Amino acid sequence: MLKWIQGGLSAVTGIAEPEYGKEYIHTVTERVEGKQPYRETTREDFFWKSPDHTNVETVTFYFSNLATGVVGFAQIIHSNIIGLHTAAQFTFRIFDSKNPEKLNLWTSTKLENFRIEDANFYADDLSVELNADNTQYRLISKVNEQSIVDLTVTRLTPGAKLGDDPSTYYGDNVEQPWGSMRHVFWPRNTCVGEIKVKIPKETAEKTAEEQAQEKEQQEEQEQEGEDEAVEETIEYEERTLKFGEDDPSYCMFVMAFQGMKPHHAAKAWNFMFFHSKENTMVLMEFTTPKSYSNTKVSIGIITNDKEILAVTHDNSALHLNQEIDSVGWNVPKQIRVELKGHKSSAKDEDVEADNDEHKIKAVVEGPLENMVERIDVMGEVPNFVKNIVSGVAGTKPYIYQFGDAENFHFQLDDGEKKNGLAWVEVTFISESEVVTEESYNEE
């Protein structure tokens, strides 16, 4: 009972959690052990949950053009803090991985008068709609004049999820958990449409590192009270990017639900997708904090151009040539992602027998030299959330984003290596391995 009370309290307040142990996390990977883990998604899998307790729910369309190297995403974020404050945001990123100094734009815009209708989402000047056949999304956003988006995303392969219920639950009762994590995917799709961007001319020639340093300086000035507004006339460069029917971009789409405070659910994430003309590979992986025994939950997907070849959970993401950066995280300079499992055609008895004929392996590896941005998460969240999270010792969340269309390659089993475009996100949230009294300090 004490642990249940502590769990409920921490879910509301955001303080660090006690060390519950392995029995207080019920992973989706454990439930599919020894079985065929691949399940095709239905339209209902993409209905918004929108519960009345603390949660963050997102849909993200990751677009990438193999020919030009342009990569990015359009994302809707719907959040609820303690059941008292509901908000929605449209975030957008576009990055030219072959010419980073020419195009690297980020926008984040608060949504007004938003509403949910099953799988669809609406707000002023924004709509996301899934067709009745569960084969196509249409995203239109005019909420920010710097990033006007009109994209149609059409499935090339079936949707995919891990197991019948793709959720990981936190707590001592699976039927009444105090937290959860869930992901469902459309791994390989075409993306047709148009994106209009307005890029500040003074940042058009700056590298991601220079922009990050400039942002840090601005934040330091704000903290020191130097917040007097300086009137400046910003000149923009307008660009229109078109993804045509004859030369579409690829898209990886994911819907995610996190039903608890982010620093309670995970202490680190590895996320990657890779597209080539023949294949797609996806990794979504998180590791829990010490309070849930540093448990790793890993979801991998391998496709060809028409089919899901495998959904896997015996995966690894190796951080290579690591180096401690200016904020203190040990950031990799290279990554190697390996997915191992059984072909989607294998039956439960085939998986249990573990015969070689049903096994499959895929590897994506490459250098993490082309950084899109190092995102200081605490600099992006509202102040009232920041005050809650900053009270937890060892919590300093940063997301490292990388995009590369030239130096990553994919290998399926012992086949030939194929080049393609990769997007990688390495996220560090908390470093504390020991729960101490200081962890509960909210001052």
Curated annotation (Swiss-Prot):
Bias-annotated ranges (Basic and acidic residues): 203-218
Region annotation Disordered: where it falls in the sequence: 203-231
Keyword Membrane recorded: yes
Record keywords, A-Z: Cytoplasm, Endoplasmic reticulum, Golgi apparatus, Lipid transport, Membrane, Nucleus, Transport
GO cellular component term, pick one: endoplasmic reticulum membrane
GO molecular function: ceramide binding
UniProt-listed GO biological process terms: ER to Golgi ceramide transport; response to oxidative stress
Subcellular location: Golgi apparatus, cis-Golgi network membrane; Endoplasmic reticulum membrane; Cytoplasm; Nucleus
UniProt topology in membrane: Peripheral membrane protein
Biased composition (Acidic residues): 219-231
Entry superkingdom: Eukaryota
Cross-referenced InterPro entries: Ceramide-binding_SVF1 (IPR051385), Svf1-like_C (IPR033394), Svf1-like_N (IPR013931)
Region described as Peripherally associates with membranes: spans on this chain: 1-18
Annotated function: Ceramide-binding protein that may transfer ceramides from the endoplasmic reticulum membrane to the cis-Golgi network membrane, and is thereby required for the biosynthesis of complex sphingolipids.
Similarity field: Belongs to the SVF1 family.
Protein name listed in UniProt: Ceramide-binding protein SVF1
Organism of origin: Candida glabrata (strain ATCC 2001 / BCRC 20586 / JCM 3761 / NBRC 0622 / NRRL Y-65 / CBS 138) (Yeast)
